[in-house]
Amino acid sequence: MPAGAEAKNLPLVVLPHGGPAARDAPGFDWWSQALASRGYAVLQPNFRGSDGFGRTFLEAGHGEWGKKMQTDLSDGVRDLAAKGLIDPERVCIVGASYGGYAALAGATIDTGVYRCAVSVAGPSDLKRMLATNKRERGVGALRYWSRFMGVDGIRDPDLALISPAAMADKTAIPVMLIHGKDDVVVAYEQSTIMADALRAAGKPVELVTLDGEDHWLSRSETRLKMLQSTVAFLEKHNPPTTPSPAAAP
């Protein structure tokens, strides 16, 4: 929550974690604190498929990429809106790695919830992601990701239905893509593919390339550049304060 703000009709940033077999826990988080300091409430949901809540909860995410793992996020938005805590017309989604995928899926698959999306090192073409993992990490990696995505390997036609790049024409909101050029976890091309798909569909997109940076944004100067780019994009497309109504004549 923004310091000193009344918990009512706040602008919201949904910040899903990466992994997806990971979790958010109470404690200092530099990214959410940076956003809260700019006036945004921040929601960090532990959606199904997150780790640390037992095997059943983890496996509940299998086959739910772009599906229930995604609607867990938008259900959180609807719950906060129903309680009057946030303004449902002022919500954006921001995330890195799997969270970046979720941000792109919020723009292309589970649409109508967000005003803008920021993906940091997020996969967009899942068929290519599987092929890259098989080539670089072996068949075990292919099986792991296929099981989590709920697909039958690289040739499964359902991959297109959960790949944001294949659904780029469904986008109705501005998208920012941020990616380290030297990322060896999620290849930089995953963001260029998404940027090309959005441009081909005539959709608004910005691509921020972090030269010499890895998947985790290990260098402080590029981490700062990511934050500055994200905040500027959010303030442009989802201002943290609503304009005052014009005075009556």
Predicted regions and their residues:
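Short loop/turn elements that form and flank the Walker-type P-loop nucleotide-binding site
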Residues: 9, 29, 38, 171-172
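Short beta-strand-to-loop junctions in surface cap/lid or active-site-entrance loops
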Residues: 1-8, 163-168
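Short, Asp-centered acidic motifs that coordinate Mg2+ and/or phosphate
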Residues: 11-12, 41, 116
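Short beta-strand element of the alpha/beta-hydrolase
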Residues: 8-18
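Short amphipathic alpha-helix adjacent to the substrate-entry channel of hydrolases
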Residues: 26-45
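Short N-terminal helix/helix-N-cap motif within the alpha/beta-hydrolase-1
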Residues: 23-26, 189
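Alpha-helical transmission elements in cytosolic ATPase-linked domains
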Residues: 15, 27-30, 109, 193
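Active-site-proximal cap/loop segments of hydrolase catalytic domains
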Residues: 45-249
